[in-house]
Amino acid sequence: MKTQRDGPSLGRWSLVLLLLGLVMPLAIVAQVLSYQEAVLRAIEGINQRSSDANLYRLLDLDPRPTMDGDPDTPKPVSFTVKETVCPRTTQKSPEDCDFKEDGLVKRCVGTVTLNQARDSFDISCDKDNRRFARLGKFFRKVKKKIGGGLKKIGQKIKDFLGNLVPRTAS
């Protein structure tokens, strides 16, 4: 008659299960992407779906919003990409490509998940018109400063000419 000592002991199975329990959470944690890694993956997807001739590369990443800890919950993202000199057909990573001088700049918004296994994103990109808005703001400031300066100069000339008029003694 066999006893428990002849087969695998309960202690060994407990040890194996304990080790598996310790290893599994590490494997799950390793699959969670950082905010920036998730955005870079989304840019890879944008480049694959794009009909433009060249790859796009991250130009500016807006600050990470406060988020919950669930990697499966879609996280809001917003960033700017710029056209590079590398053609879409290249095997290079966009990060290895230089930005194209006067390349197209796109503003992208949407959501990404940080769970590497799900690897989902919903991003839309439009031509970035913010730089033109900033240019308009710059010209308004210049106009205001020049206008104010001209008024001061005009007032000083008026005062100077007013002092040149001979005064009559009464």
UniProtKB/Swiss-Prot annotation:
Region (Active core): 150-162
Keyword Cytoplasm: no
Molecular function GO labels: lipopolysaccharide binding
Gene Ontology BP term (one): defense response to Gram-positive bacterium
InterPro entries: Cathelicidin-like, Cathelicidin_CS, Cathlecidin_C, Cystatin_sf
Highest taxon above the source species: Eukaryota
UniProt modification remark: Proteolytically cleaved by proteinase PRTN3 into antibacterial peptide LL-37. Proteolytically cleaved by cathepsin CTSG and neutrophil elastase ELANE.
Signal peptide (residue range): 1-30
Prosegment residue ranges: 31-131
One GO cellular component term noted in the UniProt record for this chain: extracellular space
Described function: Antimicrobial protein that is an integral component of the innate immune system. Binds to bacterial lipopolysaccharides (LPS). Acts via neutrophil N-formyl peptide receptors to enhance the release of CXCL2. Postsecretory processing generates multiple cathelicidin antimicrobial peptides with various lengths which act as a topical antimicrobial defense in sweat on skin. The unprocessed precursor form, cathelicidin antimicrobial peptide, inhibits the growth of Gram-negative E.coli and E.aerogenes with efficiencies comparable to that of the mature peptide LL-37 (in vitro).
PANTHER family given in the database record: CATHELICIDIN, CATHELICIDIN ANTIMICROBIAL PEPTIDE
Record note on domains: The cathelin-like domain (CLD), which is the propeptide part, does not seem to exhibit auto-inhibitory function, as it does not inhibit the antibacterial activity of antibacterial peptide LL-37.
Name of the molecule in the record: Cathelicidin antimicrobial peptide
